[in-house]
Swiss-Prot record:
One of its GO terms (cellular component) is anaphase-promoting complex. GO terms for biological process: anaphase-promoting complex-dependent catabolic process; cell division; exit from mitosis; free ubiquitin chain polymerization; positive regulation of ubiquitin protein ligase activity; protein K11-linked ubiquitination. Residues 157-211 are annotated as: Disordered. Belongs to the ubiquitin-conjugating enzyme family. Its EC number is 2.3.2.23. This is Ubiquitin-conjugating enzyme E2 S.
Length: 211
């Protein structure tokens, strides 16, 4: 594991430890801190998808990596849960101004986490790392929202499935959640109905032969 603890001054380590220790029992609403006692510079959290967004109902894991120049330089943020979002790259990297040009050394971890949660409510297509998501957000919101909801259902919806693994391809909850009421769901339903009708016809013929 690449840890930056040994590269940070003792007073910075104490500052980070104090803030994480304060945040863990009292985090911002919809955010849970997952402390890493072995490496305080690797801050992992889970964020609830905000209501009224395509991410609602999802639980998204992410992490902040505090580099050797922290807090003079901003932490790097990564989503560990796959997400379809203009400001999140394919490898999970998060693009938000507070982690770049708007960073100030006095901004704490709480502020960063709240900013990232806000990004789920108000994506910024102007600084897109996922160009397709940014384009759809501007040109076809319904398609963007549909793609984002599908990714949420597949990768981030475990909390509402009552013990069933949503990533298990054999899970009926996974298939139902992923397909929803879209054309794929209708196609599968149509195929199933045809098979049932054919089976009924065969059974009827067999019954008539017996008479």
């Amino acid at each position: 594991m690449n840890s930056n603890v040994e590269n940070l001054p003792p007073h910075v380590i104490r500052q980070v430890y104090k803030e994480v220790s304060t945040l863990t029992p009292d985090p911002p609403e919809g955010i849970k801190i997952i402390p890493n006692e072995e490496d305080i510079t690797d801050v992992q959290v889970s964020i609830e998808g905000p209501e009224g967004t395509p991410y609602a109902g999802g639980i998204f894991r992410m992490k902040l990596i505090l580099g050797k120049d922290f807090p003079a330089a901003p932490p790097k943020g990564y989503f560990l849960t796959k997400i379809f979002h203009p400001n999140v790259s394919s490898n999970g990297e998060i693009c938000v101004n507070v982690l770049k040009k708007d960073w100030k050394a006095e901004l704490g971890i709480r502020h960063v986490l709240l900013t990232i949660k806000c990004l789920l409510i108000h994506p910024n297509p102007e600084s897109a790392l996922n160009e397709e998501a940014g384009r759809l957000l501007l040109e076809n919101y319904e398609e963007y929202a549909s793609r984002a909801r599908l990714m949420t259902e597949i990768h981030a919806h475990s909390s509402s499935l009552r013990g069933k693994d949503p990533t298990d391809p054999c899970s009926s909850a996974s298939v139902t959640g992923a397909l929803g009421d879209g054309p794929m769901a209708k196609k599968h339903a149509g195929d199933r109905d045809k098979k049932l009708a054919a089976k009924k016809k065969t059974d009827k013929k067999r019954a008539l032969r017996r008479l």
